[in-house]
Each structure stands twice: as C-alpha cells, then as structure tokens.
Amino acid sequence: DLKKKTYVFEGPIDSMFIPNSIATAGGDLISAISDFPKENLVIVYDNEPRSIDTRKKIDKAIMNGYNVCIWPSNMMSKDVNDMILSGLSSDFIKYVIDTHTYRDLKAKFELNNWSKA
C-alpha cells in the first residue's frame, strides 16, 4: 500500500521481516523506485558504514530527495536478516528504522557521522 510508509530494501530476505516492504533484488535502488512517490518511501540499505559503495548509494538517495535509514552506531548486524538471526524482533527493527530515518541536510549529517563509526 503506497499510501502507507513503504520500506525499500536491496534484498528480498530483509523485506520479508518488515511490514509494507519491497525489495529491488540488487542493482540501482534509485532507478528501480523512481516512479514511486518519495514522501512515503524509506530506503533501507545494509548497515555497512565502512563500505564506500554503500555510502555512495545512500548519498545518491539523499541527493534525490528520498528518506533514508541511517543505522545507529550500536547496531552491529549487517542487515535485517542478520538482526533477526541475532535475536532482535521485527517490531524492534522497524522501530529502529523509523527512529533513524532522515532526509535532506539531517540525512547528510547523519551519513557523515555513520561513516566515521
């Protein structure tokens, strides 16, 4: 339901745990969702602050006006699937995503901090 907040993941397994989610199965996320309204989309990349590729993808999403999840520094798992395997509930993970979703300048600021973690 695109009238509700929709979570966009790279991988289909991650999208299975969060309600109202879609996955692009790799490739360029921004190109895959360019026809969807941005207001209700949250792009959720893997938790890889050391990955130059991931940081570039998040920066591209921010520059294109999307909401992005910037994982908090105390989340050690690489992705939602790993978080579930480590014992976290899908409700808790959704809460973390919702409370760490940013856009525009705040997203840039959080991305810079996350990259230093």
Place the predicted regions along the sequence by residue.
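TOPRIM fold recognition
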Residues: 3-6, 12-117
